[in-house]
């Protein structure tokens, strides 16, 4: 909406609805459990590979630069979830996550994210005198492909290409590079491979060193720039119970041993990765999770001093709050 305003377009009106969900340590149920009532906080439990997701909240927000889960939101989700599935009272949660739903808002409509439409609209802006600008807004994950198709067709027509988009019938090409993101694949791969020297670097998700090597090799010419966050996006590293507390150090050490890293950049990558994971861990820090967090802090800060590691320009990383 801000970008459309910069171009002089005032017809795009969005409602920003922040949603928070929490992730369990283990799978609670193999089917979706939805509470039969009007949509509200904590009314759906969804299986996601080896974990379950409990959500979600809905809060209208204005500032998109300060989006993070809060303890109050987590407490509310747990309380509502217990009423639906009593087992949740004894479930360990390892992470909270927040995102923003950009919902279409009709002029004069009530600013309630629960009531707003999940549909999408494609604006060509020609009525506003713009022939080189388009906006696709609204929608949800299940409609993203269709949104891209309609937008692609519009842009293609403007460029003189009348051939329709085929993403609805032609599958995207697959490849081995994405296999490491599948829950359980790395463990099956490691067991089948039977290589004693192939060390497990992430014990929670059983990601072996060979998987890290394969991921790095898929970035030819940019191996030294492959951060831990980039590796985590392409694998299950940091997704387990420890949330990167131990595997971050093992993966970094392995990359130093392989001479992929040969400067303090690897340490800064480790620091940034741990800090990013901590943002989602802090709101669910209670019970048996606390001793593990204390151990991680002692390891990362007291022993290794990652929180005091300066950037290239000598700037110290921010401290306090949720951004170590």
Show which residues each predicted segment covers.
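C-terminal catalytic lobe of FAD-dependent flavoproteins
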Residues: 2-6, 10-53, 59-239, 243, ...
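Intrinsic disorder at enzyme termini
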Residues: 179-188, 195-198, 230, 253-324
């Amino acid at each position: 909406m801000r970008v459309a305003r910069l171009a002089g377009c005032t017809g795009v009106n969005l409602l920003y609805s922040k949603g928070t969900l929490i992730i369990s340590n283990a799978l609670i149920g193999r089917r979706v459990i939805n509470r039969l009532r009007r949509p509200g906080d904590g009314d759906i439990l969804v299986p996601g590979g080896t974990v379950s997701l409990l959500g979600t909240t809905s809060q209208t927000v204005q500032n998109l630069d300060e989006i993070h889960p809060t303890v109050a939101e987590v407490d509310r989700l747990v309380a509502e979830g217990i009423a639906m599935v009593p087992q949740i009272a004894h479930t360990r949660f390892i992470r909270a996550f927040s995102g923003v739903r950009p919902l279409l808002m009709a002029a004069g409509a009530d600013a309630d994210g629960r009531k707003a439409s999940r549909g999408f609209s494609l604006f060509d802006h020609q009525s506003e005198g713009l022939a080189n600008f388009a906006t696709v807004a609204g929608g949800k994950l299940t409609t993203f492909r269709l949104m891209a198709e309609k937008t692609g067709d519009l842009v293609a027509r403007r460029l003189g290409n009348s051939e329709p988009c085929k993403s609805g019938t032609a599958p995207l090409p697959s490849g081995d590079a994405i296999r490491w993101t599948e829950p359980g694949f790395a463990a099956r791969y490691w067991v089948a491979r039977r290589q004693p020297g192939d060390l497990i670097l992430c014990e929670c998700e059983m990601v072996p060193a060979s998987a890290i090597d394969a991921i790095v090799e898929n970035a030819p010419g940019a191996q030294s720039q492959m951060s831990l966050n980039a590796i985590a996006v392409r694998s299950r590293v940091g997704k387990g119970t420890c949330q990167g507390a131990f595997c971050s150090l093992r993966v970094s050490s392995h990359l130093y041993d392989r001479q992929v890293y040969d400067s303090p950049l690897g340490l800064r990558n480790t620091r940034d990765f741990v800090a990013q994971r901590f943002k989602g861990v802090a709101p669910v820090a209670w019970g048996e999770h606390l001793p593990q967090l204390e151990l991680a802090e002692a390891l990362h800060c007291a022993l290794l001093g990652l929180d005091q590691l300066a950037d290239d320009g000598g700037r110290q990383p921010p401290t306090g709050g949720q951004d170590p």
